Regions:
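C-terminal segments that line or cap access tunnels to active or ligand-binding sites in enzymes
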Residues: 322-434
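Active-site-proximal substrate-binding core of FAD-dependent oxidoreductases
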Residues: 259, 496-517
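N-terminal glycine-rich phosphate/pyrophosphate-binding loop and immediately adjacent elements
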Residues: 4-140
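Active-site/ligand-binding neighborhood in enzyme catalytic cores
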Residues: 135-244, 251, 440-441, 445-449
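A conserved FAD-binding loop/helix module that cradles the flavin
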Residues: 59, 473-495
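Structural core of flavin- and non-heme-iron oxidoreductases
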Residues: 1-34, 38-40, 45, 115-116, ...
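A glycine-rich dinucleotide-binding beta-alpha-beta segment and adjacent secondary-structure elements
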Residues: 187-201, 355-359, 418-477
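Mid-domain catalytic core of redox enzymes
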Residues: 225, 255-375, 512
Length: 517
């Protein structure tokens, strides 16, 4: 299962990309050591504890379950036996000023009925047409782009072939998501609802390509609630990697990636300890590498992300609160009254929006659809998120500004009928996120997906420095929990392929790895 020489890999960061790569590499006979400066795994998938109650304070939506099922299958394990998941009956509950409310469901037919009641039969029919296009967009891009190791516009066209050129044209890469949605929905609230999917990639619907409508299809394929919270997924991946032989060291801050004879040779920790390795996988934001956070010698490994090209950051409130009135479900969205202004303020003026949309994850609400607050836990664990500019390395967000955000949350919630009585709150700003993820300004999704070519400019696993590889949401195929996991698998596949080509005999096993069709 391994070559005569035992290859050693150091993984910098125990985020989802680093964890999946560690599972793959350790299972194939590579000696793996994961170095993480935080006290626990997960990266952005973090938990904060208030009054002894853990609150997911990072990604809260799990889709594309098959990514993790395939990972565990590839190393001889079963994902379902390691983690308990429940499919959400309602994808999200959406609210607008004036009391209008719309639920989207796991079943397209049920969502169409809800949209019909909300906005009329014609909008319901347009929704079905939109779903068809979202599915076609995903199916067109899944193989030649999402699962491809190093996609380019040329490779995408070549893999599509002459018969597939029409499909590529129909995904409308040169049209913005907002413009494309206008061709489907006449009700501005529905355009706003589905335009929000651009924020899943840290982007503006007014600048992101129409291809991002594929997110709608991904959600319709299933949104899953994780027993124990999203952080339990990180712990499950960590446990699997350990069973395969990977070692983990927490509280280990990497100061430098070593480069000798033009190739990576290991790392140096903040305490001066040198760890040698012939493979270094950086599960860190690519901006940190380009900014020299791991040493000047590796800054050339990947192109920098200009501050103007950064994705969204956020102001988040992890909260325990008594609730009354509005019946929260697991995922809730309270929309602003002027969506274009909201994104103009974030990406143009570089300030927190005056009237932002609010996302709320009510973590004590289950998967079953309810229209009442019966059996609600009190106080509830709530996670509020407001999109913000990634300028955490340029300015400080003062107390007055953050208090204004908090007041807006309470006011907008109350206008929708939700009464909140917070008992404990932890706040995270773009400045805090920049501290957690240096070199990013607090950007949470890498580079913004603005323009048709943005997705192709994300770096792939291989870098300009032999032996140094990348994984994570800022690398290909992009942000989000399943995509970050796929980036780890793609990186592991690239590493194994390179080791195989460099080692004549015996070969490093790659069976069961991710298909790169």
């Amino acid at each position: 299962m391994s070559s005569r020489k035992t290859h050693r890999a150091v993984v910098i960061g125990a985020g989802i990309g680093g964890l999946t790569a560690a599972v793959e590499l350790a299972a194939r006979g590579i000696e793996v050591e994961v170095l993480e400066r935080a006290p626990s795994p997960g990266g952005k998938m973090r938990q904060l504890v208030l009054d002894d109650r853990p609150i997911d304070s990072g990604p809260t939506v799990l889709t594309m379950r098959w990514v993790f099922e395939q990972l565990f299958d590839s190393v001889g394990e079963t994902f379902d036996s390691q983690l308990s998941l429940e499919q959400a009956e309602v994808l999200a509950r959406h609210s607008w000023r004036g009391g209008a409310r719309l639920d989207l469901f796991a079943e397209v037919a049920r969502s169409a009925d809800a949209i019909g009641d909300f906005a009329g039969a014609k909008e319901a029919a347009r929704f079905r047409a939109f779903c068809d296009r979202a599915r076609a967009t995903y199916e067109t891009l899944e193989g030649p782009f999402i699962k491809a190791r190093e996609p380019t516009p040329l490779s995408l066209t070549r893999k599509a072939g002459i018969k597939g050129l029409g499909d590529l044209w129909r995904i409308s890469p040169f049209t913005t998501l907002w413009s494309a949605l206008g061709g489907y929905f006449k009700d501005p609230r529905l355009r706003q609802l589905f335009g929000r999917y651009a924020t899943y990639c840290g982007s503006s619907p007014f600048e992101a390509p129409a291809t991002l409508m594929l997110v709608a299809h991904v959600e319709q394929e299933g949104v899953w609630l994780v027993e124990g919270g999203m952080h339990a997924l990180a712990r499950t991946l960590e446990a699997c990697a350990k069973r395969k032989g990977a070692a983990f060291r927490y509280g280990s801050d990497v100061r430098e990636i070593l480069v000798e004879h033009s190739a990576s040779r290991g790392v140096v920790l903040a305490n001066g300890e040198r760890i040698e390795a012939d493979i270094v996988l950086a599960n860190a934001d690519v901006s940190a590498i380009a900014a020299g956070k791991f040493g000047a010698s590796v800054a050339v490994a990947t192109p920098p992300v200009a501050p103007k090209s950064r994705s969204l950051s956020a102001v988040t409130f992890s909260m325990l609160a008594k609730t009354d009135g509005f019946p929260l479900t697991r995922h809730n969205v309270f929309f602003s009254t002027n969506y274009r202004r909201e994104f103009d303020e974030i990406f143009g003026a570089k300030r927190i929006p005056t009237n932002p949309t609010i996302y709320v994850c009510a973590q004590d609400r289950g998967a079953v659809w309810r229209q009442s607050n019966d059996n609600a836990v009190s106080p509830e664990r709530l996670f509020f998120l407001i999109n913000a500019p990634a300028v955490g390395d340029m300015r400080t967000f003062g107390t007055e500004e953050i208090e204004r955000c908090r007041d807006h949350i309470l006011d907008l919630s109350q206008r929708a009928g939700l009464i909140l009585e917070p008992t404990a709150t932890a706040i995270t700003t773009p400045q805090d996120f920049n501290g957690l993820f240096p070199g990013t300004g607090g950007a949470l999704y890498g580079q913004a997906s603005h323009g048709w070519n943005a997705s192709f400019t994300r770096p792939t696993a291989r870098t300009k420095i032999p032996g140094l590889y990348l994984a994570g949401g800022s690398a290909h195929p992009g942000p989000g929990v399943p995509m970050a996991a796929m980036s780890g698998r793609l990186a592991a596949a690239s590493i194994l392929e390179d080791l195989t080509s460099a080692t004549p005999s015996p070969r490093v096993a790659t069976s069961g790895g991710m298909s790169m069709a």
